[in-house]
UniProtKB/Swiss-Prot annotation:
Annotated SUPFAM superfamilies: C-terminal domain of alpha and beta subunits of F1 ATP synthase (SSF47917), N-terminal domain of alpha and beta subunits of F1 ATP synthase (SSF50615), P-loop containing nucleoside triphosphate hydrolases (SSF52540)
Protein location: Plastid, Chloroplast thylakoid membrane
Record has Disulfide bond as a keyword: no
Pfam families according to UniProt: ATP-synt_ab, ATP-synt_ab_N, ATP-synt_VA_C
Domain of life: Eukaryota
Binding site for ATP: 172-179
Classification via HAMAP family: ATP_synth_beta_bact
GO annotations of cellular component type: chloroplast thylakoid membrane; mitochondrion; proton-transporting ATP synthase complex
Function of the molecule: Produces ATP from ADP in the presence of a proton gradient across the membrane. The catalytic sites are hosted primarily by the beta subunits.
Protein name: ATP synthase subunit beta, chloroplastic
Gene Ontology terms for molecular function: ATP binding; ATP hydrolysis activity; proton-transporting ATP synthase activity, rotational mechanism
Gene that this polypeptide is encoded by: atpB
Length: 495
């Protein structure tokens, strides 16, 4: 971490002796720069190109050194559009890696990959900055305590609980509700835990980033009247950005989160939407740098790049970073190298199912595909573990019976199997829940359900006490008492 003497808006340190080079070649977002002999910049150094284009417009492009080519040439990847750059333009070597503002000044603000505010709310205090490239915490600094992180979402807390200071993946294809689930988690965690969150928007839609910002202002996660009391910092590198920005924006968000953990000694939430776009940007950069592609066209350094990001997301004795990462699954294929590499780093996986989404069950979390290393009796307790296992067994049996039902119909099943199907359908519907952030679309007020209430509800369904209630009563409700009240209302409407 660096303490800068000035509060100027630039995150690039001023240099007494400028090391100057010149652009020799431009290939889209990749620049080749020639430096004087003996003055080559290091890998990951930030280079700045300043000047004017042919129309007289001001140009200020920051690049990051990726390769030393020999013959005093380096190859760098631009963090913003290279429009207007020409061969022969002067390039300044800053002598250091990209540094971004960190600390309380970042809360309630939106930044780009360079740590520059993009929300038109004026400059940010940049006295405290930190380089985006650093090593992961040493083994001796790590904290090994195991504790559950309650989210207030029934299906998550019961069947695939999150670990405090762990890494969680949200897996799903296009349009099954990853971003909505992330927004709900930010909302619940800010309200229930009062914690600080950092959101890294990596290569997703600009509209979604805008919606998220507006949503946070509405729900009070970002406090417009007193910005310092906000609970979240946002870092965006959206779909329209060059691959260099999309590849590094995750590191910018992580650097801000690390400061809250290491210096402020806080428990932080880091949201990355979408980790697949980080891999995709790395693949684009790899091709532009001329590396031979590996399986399915991905970069040969896929595991290394993923590891360097993921290993920094961890709990230390000072504080913790709990990371929730949306993972787009190309063509719904979980064996694709991008999601498969991500799997190796995760403590819990929340898999979103298109089938459940088509049935209108939201959140569309697949209860049988979602997993967690925390679902063990010694961690969650015997009662929670038993309930979760019985819920899974009931749903698994229902899944096995679906083919028979499709061919022969429900009447051909044994009495016991019919009872299992009825309870499984109730469980399936009770796993749905109205979200605070979706109130606008659904018209139903959002619900936060504590873990004890969740376990009690599923125990009542499994015990058979609620067999007489219609399955529709369990759809989009909070706790089990709301389901029984809804059943009475439905009964009243029939009469």
């Amino acid at each position: 971490m660096r303490i800068n003497p000035t509060t100027s808006g630039s995150t690039v340190p001023t240099l007494e002796e400028k090391n100057l080079g010149r652009i020799a070649q431009i290939i889209g977002p990749v620049l080749d720069v020639v430096f004087p002999p003996g003055k080559m910049p290091n890998i990951y150094n930030a280079l700045v190109v300043k000047g004017r284009d042919t129309v007289g417009q001001q140009i200020n492009v920051t690049c990051e050194v990726q390769q030393l080519l020999g013959n005093n040439r380096v190859r760098a990847v631009a963090m913003s559009a290279t429009d207007g750059l020409t061969r022969g333009m002067e390039v300044i070597d800053t002598g250091a890696a990209l540094s971004v503002p960190v600390g309380g000044a970042t809360l309630g603000r939106i930044f780009n990959v360079l740590g520059e505010p993009v929300d038109n709310l004026g400059p940010v205090d940049t006295r405290t900055t930190s380089p985006i490239h650093r090593s992961a915490p040493a083994f001796i600094q790590l904290d090994t305590k195991l504790s559950i992180f309650e989210t207030g979402i029934k299906v998550v807390d019961l069947l695939a609980p999150y670990r405090r200071g762990g890494k969680i993946g949200l897996f799903g294809g296009a349009g099954v509700g990853k971003t909505v689930l992330i927004m709900e988690l930010i909302n619940n965690i800010a309200k229930a835990h009062g914690g600080v969150s950092v959101f890294g928007g990596v290569g997703e839609r600009t509209r979604e980033g805008n919606d998220l910002y507006m949503e946070m202002k509405e729900s009070g996660v970002i406090n417009e009247k007193n910005i310092a009391e906000s609970k979240v910092a946002l870092v965006y590198g959206q779909m329209n950005e060059p691959p260099g920005a999309r590849m590094r924006v995750g590191l910018t968000a992580l650097t801000m989160a690390e400061y809250f953990r290491d210096v402020n000694e806080q428990d932080v939430l880091l949201f990355i939407d979408n980790i697949f776009r980080f891999v995709q940007a790395g693949s684009e950069v790899s091709a532009l740098l001329g590396r031979m592609p590996s399986a399915v066209g991905y970069q040969p350094t896929l595991s290394t790049e993923m590891g360097s990001l993921q290993e920094r997301i961890t709990s230390t004795k000072e504080g913790s970073i709990t990371s929730i990462q949306a993972v787009y699954v190309p063509a719904d294929d979980l064996t694709d190298p991008a999601p498969a590499t991500t799997f190796a780093h995760l403590d819990a996986t929340t898999v979103l199912s298109r089938g459940l989404s088509a049935k209108g069950i939201y959140p569309a979390v697949d209860p049988l595909d979602s997993t967690s290393t925390m679902l063990q009796p010694r961690i969650v307790g015997e009662e929670h573990y038993e309930t979760a296992q019985r819920v899974k067994q009931t749903l698994q049996r229902y899944k096995e019976l679906q083919d028979i039902i499709a061919i022969l119909g429900l009447d051909e099943l044994s009495e016991e199997d019919r009872l299992t199907v009825a309870r499984a359908r109730k469980i399936e519907r009770f796993l749905s829940q109205p979200f605070f952030v979706a109130e606008v679309f659904t018209g139903s007020p959002g619900k936060y359900v504590g873990l004890a209430e969740t376990i009690r509800g599923f125990q009542l369904i499994l015990s058979g006490e609620l067999d007489g209630l219609p399955e529709q009563a369990f759809y989009l409700v909070g706790n089990i008492d709301e389901a029984t009240a809804k059943a009475m209302n439905l009964e009243g409407e029939k009469k």
